[in-house]
């Protein structure tokens, strides 16, 4: 049995160096890097993992990381914005891939999405549902009517913005806002939670 001309008889093969795989996902046309690659949180985690192979984190950082990846939202669909809110959870946009899943009970929810016109009669019910949510709780105001009364701003029966009833974390403008706009609002809320933490709140 002879050796082929390409075979080498030198000692044992040396291990190949580890090479990171090529970037995948949606690329930013300006930088050529994946979208979100400049997020401070992920850069710190990636650098620490590359350095040691493991990372040490404070409990608050761990809780904040877990909370941003498992936000449960409660629907408070009051008008036509609720149609776009429902579309956000359908297969085309699939909000659950961001860890954002709907819940039927306020006691299991972290986020309330107020979508539509808030009337004076509905305001006490909105506050009651908000009070039933466990801390820390967040509110997204969706659409012009929820943000400031919208088309019905001068009506005697309409609350001119749901921020008069509950504290708002994210405002999503539009009449009605698209599902993409609401999804972007959810991603902004996740960034806000990462930035401020959950125990401090």
Swiss-Prot record:
Cofactor binding summary note: Binds 1 [4Fe-4S] cluster.
Top-rank taxon: Bacteria
This protein's UniProt keywords: 4Fe-4S, Cell inner membrane, Cell membrane, Iron, Iron-sulfur, Membrane, Metal-binding, NAD, Quinone, Translocase, Transport, Ubiquinone
Primary localization class, coarse: membrane
Entry keyword annotation includes GTP-binding: no
GO biological process assignments: aerobic respiration; electron transport coupled proton transport
Any one GO MF annotation of this record: quinone binding
Residues annotated to bind [4Fe-4S] cluster: 80-81, 145, 175
Role played: NDH-1 shuttles electrons from NADH, via FMN and iron-sulfur (Fe-S) centers, to quinones in the respiratory chain. The immediate electron acceptor for the enzyme in this species is believed to be ubiquinone. Couples the redox reaction to proton translocation (for every two electrons transferred, four hydrogen ions are translocated across the cytoplasmic membrane), and thus conserves the redox energy in a proton gradient.
Family according to the record: Belongs to the complex I 20 kDa subunit family.
HAMAP family: NDH1_NuoB
Quaternary structure and partners: NDH-1 is composed of 14 different subunits. Subunits NuoB, C, D, E, F, and G constitute the peripheral sector of the complex.
Protein name, per record: NADH-quinone oxidoreductase subunit B 1
């Amino acid at each position: 049995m002879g050796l082929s001309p390409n075979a080498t008889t030198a000692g044992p093969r040396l291990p190949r160096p580890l090479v990171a795989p090529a970037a995948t996902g949606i690329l930013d046309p300006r930088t050529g890097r994946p979208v979100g690659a400049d997020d401070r949180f992920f850069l710190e985690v990636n650098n620490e993992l590359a350095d040691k192979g493991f990372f040490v984190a404070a409990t608050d950082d761990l809780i904040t990381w877990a909370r941003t990846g498992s936000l449960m939202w409660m629907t408070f669909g009051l008008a036509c914005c609720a149609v776009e809110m429902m579309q956000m959870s359908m297969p085309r946009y699939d909000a659950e891939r961001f860890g954002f899943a709907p819940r039927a009970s306020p006691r299991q929810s972290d986020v309330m999405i107020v979508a539509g016109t808030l009337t004076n009669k509905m305001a006490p019910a909105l506050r009651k549902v908000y009070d039933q949510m466990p801390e820390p709780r967040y509110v997204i105001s969706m659409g012009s009517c929820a943000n400031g009364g919208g088309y019905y701003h001068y009506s005697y029966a309409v609350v001119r913005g749901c921020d008069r009833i509950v504290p708002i974390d994210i405002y999503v403008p539009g009449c009605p806002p698209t599902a993409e706009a609401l999804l972007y609002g959810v991603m902004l809320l996740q960034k806000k939670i990462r930035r401020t933490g959950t125990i401090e709140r």
